[in-house]
Amino acid sequence: IIYPGTLWCGNGNIANGTNELGLWKETDACCRTHDMCPDIIEAHGSKHGLTNPADYTRLNCECDEEFRHCLHNSGDAVSAAFVGRTYFTILGTQCFRLDYPIVKCKVKSTILRECKEYEFDTNAPQKYQWFDVLSY
């Protein structure tokens, strides 16, 4: 399913090439960049010692953070907000990154209960781990 007016926002893309964008160009450009994240773990795939249990691809946290920033700065306010809420809030996904081992979640959001702040063991070596993606 691709969001109307875009070619890149949704499951896969329907573009004829990497330079083609839909009607909502700024939102679509954000989705295209997100789709091209170089560090991903496919659905049910493994990488960096992690296995993705989800039915969709998960990305390095840096790519998700860039995606959020891009959507917030998009001139296509309505389509960007819809895509942002769908991906970050409704999907409730996780991203991964290299960091000190998580000891526990220090602060959870009130409604969706995603972890907003983690406590880390800074004496242990860093490793790849899953992190909650915050709501849009």
From Swiss-Prot:
GO cellular component, one term: extracellular region
GO biological process: arachidonate secretion; lipid catabolic process; phospholipid metabolic process
Subcellular location, record wording: Secreted
Residue positions with a glycan: 16
Disulfide-bonded cysteines: 9-31, 30-70, 37-63, 61-95, 105-115
Tissue: Expressed by the venom gland.
Binding-site residues for Ca(2+), renumbered to this chain: 8, 10, 12, 35
Requisite cofactors: Ca(2+)
Reaction catalyzed: a 1,2-diacyl-sn-glycero-3-phosphocholine + H2O = a 1-acyl-sn-glycero-3-phosphocholine + a fatty acid + H(+)
EC code(s) of this entry: 3.1.1.4
Cofactor binding, note field: Binds 1 Ca(2+) ion.
Keyword terms: Allergen, Calcium, Disulfide bond, Glycoprotein, Hydrolase, Lipid degradation, Lipid metabolism, Metal-binding, Secreted
Keyword Ubl conjugation among UniProt keywords: no
Annotated catalytic residues: 34, 64
Highest rank taxon of the organism: Eukaryota
Pfam families on file: Phospholip_A2_2 (PF05826)
Keyword DNA repair: no
GO function term, MF aspect, one: metal ion binding
Family that this chain belongs to: Belongs to the phospholipase A2 family.
Known role: PLA2 catalyzes the calcium-dependent hydrolysis of the 2-acyl groups in 3-sn-phosphoglycerides.
Cross-referenced PANTHER family: RH14732P
Protein name per the record: Phospholipase A2
Organism: Bombus pensylvanicus
